Amino acid sequence: MRPNKTSLLLALLSILSQANAYEYVNCFSSLPSDFSKADSYNWQSSSHCNSECSAKGASYFALYNHSECYCGDTNPSGSESTSSSCNTYCFGYSSEMCGGEDAYSVYQLDSDTNSNSISSSDSSTESTSASSSTTSSTTSSTTSTTSSTTSSTTSSMASSSTVQNSPESTQAAASISTSQSSSTVTSESSLTSDTLATSSTSSQSQDATSIIYSTTFHTEGGSTIFVTNTITASAQNSGSATGTAGSDSTSGSKTHKKKANVGAIVGGVVGGVVGAVAIALCILLIVRHINMKREQDRMEKEYQEAIKPVEYPDKLYASSFSSNHGPSSGSFEEEHTKGQTDINPFDDSRRISNGTFINGGPGGKNNVLTVVNPDEAD
C-alpha cells in the first residue's frame, strides 16, 4: 500500500515544527539566576543562540556583548530592570544587536515549538486524482498561536522556511513583508516529491531578526491547498534558501575579514622592512661622518707638528770665544780637555777660517787668508 498523503503531511509538519521560532522580549541590565551561559561564538546571532537554547529545552535566551549566549526558563520582565544599553552588534549578523557591555537582549522561544508536541495519526484518506472522492480525516494539529481550521485536516505552524507560488519553488523573505500564497497538490507522487524538497530547505535560512511564518493547508475535493503567511522584520539573504545559521550565513564577511587581515599583515611587514632600511642608512651616514671628522683632526694635528719651529735655548749654545774668554788656540788637547758641549753652528759670535784658496802661488809662496770678526777686538 502506498503512503497516505495525510501521513506524509503530518510528517512534514513534525519536521518543520522543529524549526526555531522566537520573539524579542526586551533589553535588561541583568538576568535571573537560572540563566546559564550556553556558549561564546565568534559568529554569534540570535538564530545561533536560539538553536543552542532550543536544544537544551530552555524557554528564553539572551545575547550579551557581541558573542555570548545565555539560556534560562524565567522571564526577566517580572524581576529585572530594563535597560537602553543594548547597542553592541552581533558578530555573526551586524544588523542585529547582541546586548551590550552591561546589558542583555532577551528573546522568548515559542513554547509549542520547543515542546515539539505534534500529534500524528494514520489517516485513511487517499486521493489519486482531483476528481476522485476523498474521505476526510479528523486529525488536527496546532503548533503556533496563530491557527485556523479551514477543512477537516488543518495544521498551523511557525518555522523558518516558506513555500510560495508553487510546490516546486522555495525562497527566503528578504524585507519587511507579508505574503500569502497557495498551492494545490493533485497527485500523490507530486505530494511526495514536494514534501521532500520542502523538508530539505526547511532547516535553512535562519538569519532573520524576527520572523514569524504561519502555514496552513486543507484538503478539498481530492486536492491539498497550502496557504502561507509570512511576516518578516528583516533578513540577510533573498532568493533560494541557501544560508544556514552560524558560520555559513556569514562566510562572506568572514572572507572579507580574512582578506583585510592579510592586507594589514603585508602592509606591516613592508613598512617594517622600509623602516629598518632607513634606520640602517642613517646609522651608516652618522658613522661615516664621525670617521671623516676624526681623519681630518688627525691630519691637521700632523700638519701642525710638521710646521712647528724648533727652539734652541741660548744657554746651551754659547760661542767658543765667549766660553773661553779669548781666542782658541785650536789645539786638539784643548778641545777635548774642556769637555764636549752642544754648539749651535749658526749661533757663534766669531768665525775663524784658516786656509788658502790657492795652494801654490806664482812665486811659490802660500798666502794665508785670515778672517776675523771685526766686531770683536784682538
UniProtKB/Swiss-Prot annotation:
Q: List the biased-composition ranges (Low complexity).
A: 236-253, 319-331
Q: Which PROSITE patterns match?
A: WSC
Sites carrying sugar chains: N65
Keyword Lyase in annotation: no
Consequence of changing Y303A: Sensitive to alkali. Fails to restore normal levels of SLT2 phosphorylation upon alkaline stress
The record's region (Disordered) falls at 115-201, 236-256, 318-378
What is known to happen upon mutating S320A?
Answer: No phosphorylation
The record's listing under Pfam families reads:
WSC
Out of the domains of life, which is the source? Eukaryota
What is the annotated localization of this protein?
Cell membrane
Outcome of mutating S323A: No phosphorylation
User: Which GO biological-process labels does this protein carry?
Assistant: actin cytoskeleton organization; endocytosis; establishment of cell polarity; fungal-type cell wall organization; pexophagy; positive regulation of endocytosis; response to heat; response to osmotic stress
Q: What does this protein do?
A: Plays a role during G1 to regulate entering or exiting the cell cycle. Involved in stress responses. Has a role in cell wall integrity signaling. Activates ROM1 or ROM2 catalyzed guanine nucleotide exchange toward RHO1. Important regulator of the actin cytoskeleton rearrangements in conditions of cell wall expansion and membrane stretching. Specifically required for the actin reorganization induced by hypo-osmotic shock. Multicopy suppressor of 1,3-beta-glucan synthase (GS). Activates GS upstream of RHO1. Acts positively on the PKC1-MAPK pathway.
Q: What else is known?
A: Present with 664 molecules/cell in log phase SD medium.
The name of this protein is: Protein SLG1
